[in-house]
Amino acid sequence: MEASYESESESESEAGPGTQRPGTGTVSAAVREHLRKLCLREFPCGAGSWNKSRFLPQTWRTWRELVPREEDVVSPGEETVEALLGLVRSRHSPWALLNNSNAEDSFLRELAIRNPLTITDTFFYSYFRSLRVIDKKVTLVDKDLLKFLKLEELVLSANRIKEVDATNLPPTLKVLELYGNEISSMECLCAHPPAGLQHLGLGHNKLLGPLESLYVTANHWPNLVSLDLGFNDLTDLQSMVTSLRTLRHLRLLVLQGNPLALVPYYRGLTIDSLAQLCVLDDITVSPNEKHLFRGLSLNGDLLAQEAQFVVTIGNIRGVLDTSVLDPEPRPEGPFITYNYYVTYDFVKDEEGEMNESAGVLAEIVKPSPSLELLVEESPEEVVEDVIEDIVEEVTEEVEGSLESEVEESGESELSVISGPSTILQMPRASAEELAKLRLRIDPRLCPSPGTVLFSTAHKPWAEVIPCSYEMQHSLRDLVPLKAFLLAGTTVTIVEEKILSWPVVLPAVDSPLSAKKGKGEKDKKGKEKDRTGKGEKEPAKEWKVLKKKKEPPKELRQDPPILQVLGRGLVILEPLLAGEPLVSTVCNFGVVRTLTSDRLTLARDSKKIKKVAKKEKPKAVIPIYEGDYHPEPLTVEVQIQLNQCRSAEEALRMFAV
């Protein structure tokens, strides 16, 4: 028989059935409180005026009077047993059981109606074989549990127990479930554990470190058949399986959710080390698995304890083509380019990834210097220095700000091509520059504490932008990795807008008078050359003017303007729960508009006509508002946890 208890708030009323009530927060107090709520000694249960004639002393009656007569079966003002049972069985009765009650509660109430004199403390202590105290804010396993002489199962899930005094556990106990508590070490359970315990459940507690493997040996649990240590912070797989090997009766084991279960060879090493194991992490161990990982435990100490993840980012769809909304560039600029990329955060690694990720972070948040010259560079090339270099560059610019004003002296040949020269304004102070920099950094592009930001390559706009990104993360610090997987990773689609301006290099070393004389001399020389060449010079000048609208080769770039187009969380907890792959399409909603798509269609149709002049141009299908269904902004994300499929693969990839 058993009694189950669901989550309810405790009451301050007097407890029953005993005369004394233990302190709140103990197991026995929770049991007594539940029994009190069953009202086993109150109407319609128990003995009272409603059934007293059935329990009057019978010694003074003659033997003829002991035979019940029809009219004397129920005295006036009393209820029959059937009527009382109907009151507790009917759902509409005010004495009906609560919704979260079970069959055991119903049995006890009916017993209290049929034979209320049996409801005593002695009865309860000998009656219960199973106690379930779930989510009752219990903090202490008290010694009153020893009064339950036949107790075999004790379930204390979802409470606040930090330590368990094993001396207070009944020696008859076979099942002890402590799932979802706050136990930080198994040492407290090993003082005087029940010798006949067959199942121990410690899932979702706070077990931490490699020393916990010392407390899962046959010296403490000689008859253990089932062990649940899932979702703790256990780290040393080799030590754990070495200790578990001593449990000869162990058949069911749960270790998933621990950092040690993230290593690629976890399942193979555990299966090969525990030959008698039947079920691991709720998955039956097959003979084929035993064959594939045979011999792996002999080389377990040679395997590196690290987890490997592969992050793949596919296509971006539904991006708004912002360039069609910008005006045509003028000769003096600015020339605007747009790039798009995806960022995600991942937990820090000790060695390899730190150098690369620092460059990625600087690429995202650091503006290019105001005087940097980019000679025929593609828009995808960006600055790769770390953020700390900004302060040094700003200091150098401030020192050179005294020479920032340069007088113009005539028009040069470069001004004919690129338009009027622009005087570059230096920053006035480093504080102002840093203040501007802070404004340019979107807080959504900064990684959360303990993580590093990674980015795909910067790509120009297209209907479908292929990222073709794949990154392998190898991590040795497994405890922070578990915390990261529980939190998930944030995926962001970023639009980068870069404004480029033509650069005019003024001659600083020549005085004004010398420039003027030189200008007249050059003018005369040009006229002489033009006379010798005849009418060829005007044609050349016309070609130069014709190329006036082309962007110059030497440009300076403004700091990139970043805009977050979409941002969302990718849940990674399934990887911790045993799933090898998380694959999703992040949907950030529709960002395109009918106007922008019409402009994009018109621009693309012009390009097609220019390329295929000789061919018959294809008819452009117009976009009507009624049929307009824009594609939402999406990106394909896949994160895979590497897992070894055989002992040979594990030794080849992870042997030190």
Swiss-Prot record:
Entry-linked Gene3D superfamilies: Ribonuclease Inhibitor (3.80.10.10)
InterPro entries associated with the record: Cilia_flagella_integrity, Leu-rich_rpt, LRR_dom_sf
Biased composition (Acidic residues): 1-13
Domain LRRCT residue range list: 258-296
Keyword Repeat carried by entry: yes
Biased composition (Basic and acidic residues): 517-544
Coiled coil stretches, renumbered: none
Pfam family, one: LRR_8
Lineage: superkingdom: Eukaryota
Per-repeat ranges for LRR: 150-170, 172-193, 196-215, 223-244
UniProt keyword annotations, A-Z: Leucine-rich repeat, Repeat
Positions of the UniProt region annotated as Disordered: 1-25, 512-554
Protein name: Leucine-rich repeat-containing protein 43
